[in-house]
UniProtKB/Swiss-Prot annotation:
This is Lichenin. GO terms for cellular component: extracellular region. It comes from the Bacteria. Its main location: secreted. It comes from Bacillus licheniformis.
Length: 12
C-alpha cells in the first residue's frame, strides 16, 4: 500500500 506515501510525495 503506497497510496498514502504517493499522496504525501505528490503533495510535496
Amino acid at each position: 500500500i503506497s497510496l498514502e506515501i504517493c499522496x504525501i510525495f505528490h503533495d510535496n
